[in-house]
Amino acid sequence: MPQLAGAEALVRLDPVFAQLAAGVGHNLWGLAHLTMREKAFVCLTADLCHPHLDVPLAMHVQMALSNQVEPEAIRELYRHLAPYVGYPILVTAFQRLAELGLPEARDDKPVELTPLRGELARAVHDLAAVDQGLAEFSEEQLAQRWARPGLSVRERAIACLVVDVCYQTLGESLRLHAALARSAGATDDTLRDLVRGVAEFGMARSWAAARALGL
């Protein structure tokens, strides 16, 4: 079990709360069916959703780096999440990453579009029947990021599932991202652990997500 970053600081804030927080931290980091990178991405994604970009983000960045998550992977996670959590919060998040000493971005290449396939293509096709303009916007956003290097499709889908749980988008968005995760190797056990891990950021939301996923 990894040492939780920031534990001593929490004790200084409130010793009883620190014990409670350590318990939920060990719950997440002890889950067997998520990789250490994925556990870090759960935390870093939830930080954008609420948002809490002060001490919690600092603790989660430290935990990610101490578990061999590359700084550029943290950046890529946040690039990926922009259309899901909203571009404006990412401006503040990248400012905070700079303040926390994360190295400057290594990737400055022009963003390329990769044609969508499979579940993503079907989602855009279905959306076009509702609103063609929105479908075109969504297609561009998806084509810009799902095939980029630095994160696997499974990692990207898991991060999007965290957003779905936090924002309670438990219909077609949740189903799409669960299908993408499964197509990239995730199992029901993976999804169960994900929902259990996200419970740290809002228990009742995880209850609803578990029911929506049929877990």
Where are these regions (language model features)?
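Acidic, glycine/proline-rich low-complexity segments that act as flexible tails and inter-domain linkers
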Residues: 1-38, 49-51, 55-58, 65-66, ...
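Short, structured motif recognition centered on aromatic/hydrophobic residues
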Residues: 40-47, 77-78, 156-164, 195
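A short structural micro-motif
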Residues: 48-49, 80-87, 165-166, 197-204
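A broadly conserved amphipathic alpha-helix scaffold signal in soluble, globular proteins
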Residues: 62, 79-82, 95-98, 196
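Hydrophobic alpha-helical bundle cores within soluble ligand-binding/oligomerization subdomains
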Residues: 64, 75-76, 193
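Alpha-helical oligomerization segments
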Residues: 187-215
